[in-house]
Design a protein with these regions (language model features):
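Upstream accessory/linker segments immediately N-terminal to the RecA-like ATPase cores of bacterial MutS
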Residues: 140-147, 157
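Short, low-order "capping/linker" segments at domain edges
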Residues: 156-162
Length: 167
């Protein structure tokens, strides 16, 4: 049992390292292609591990707050994961792009997709047009709704702990 536990721990550490490396590579790609200026994010690499691209897409949503697609290549196809923001239905967007996709499925905030490598740029352009048309500048800002204002002088360990427990 201990041996199995150690193996699982090692696999988890490797997954975290791969996740971190892939996320860093995706951020570099976004900056290099100036995707921060777009209404959506689409990043891809031939050798990213398909088991972590959904996690990477979620991390990119946290950082850039745009509908995000992360793709990796398998033979002549890109397979990937889409994540969305409040107010934008990623499944409906993929459905509108279905003429260039081999497969897709999912729901409003998360989906999977597969497309031929020859259709990548066409898909990228179609998806960006959809997001640009349906997402306002206000939607590109991750907002938080709060119940009350607290002054700095009201904060102490007990109140912060209580607030953390209720979140």
């Amino acid at each position: 049992t201990i041996h199995l536990s150690e193996q699982i721990q090692l696999i988890n550490v490797e997954r975290r390292e791969e996740d971190k490396k892939t996320t860093e590579e995706a951020i570099i790609q976004i900056k290099d292609k100036e995707e921060e200026l777009f209404s959506s994010t689409l990043v891809y690499h031939d050798n990213w591990h398909p088991g972590i691209i959904g996690i990477v897409a979620s991390r990119l949503i946290e950082k850039y707050y745009r509908p995000t697609i992360v793709l990796t290549k398998r033979n002549e196809y890109y397979i990937g994961s889409a994540r969305s923001i409040k107010g934008f239905d990623s499944y409906k967007a993929l459905k509108k792009c279905s003429d260039v996709l081999e497969q897709f499925g999912g729901h409003k905030y998360a989906a999977g997709l597969k497309l031929h490598e020859s259709k990548l740029e066409l898909f990228r352009n179609e998806f960006e047009k959809l997001t640009n048309k349906h997402i306002s500048d206000e939607q590109k800002i991750n907002s938080c709704i709060y119940d009350l204002e607290i002054s700095l002088s009201d904060l102490n360990i007990k109140s912060v702990s209580y607030t953390h427990l209720r979140a």
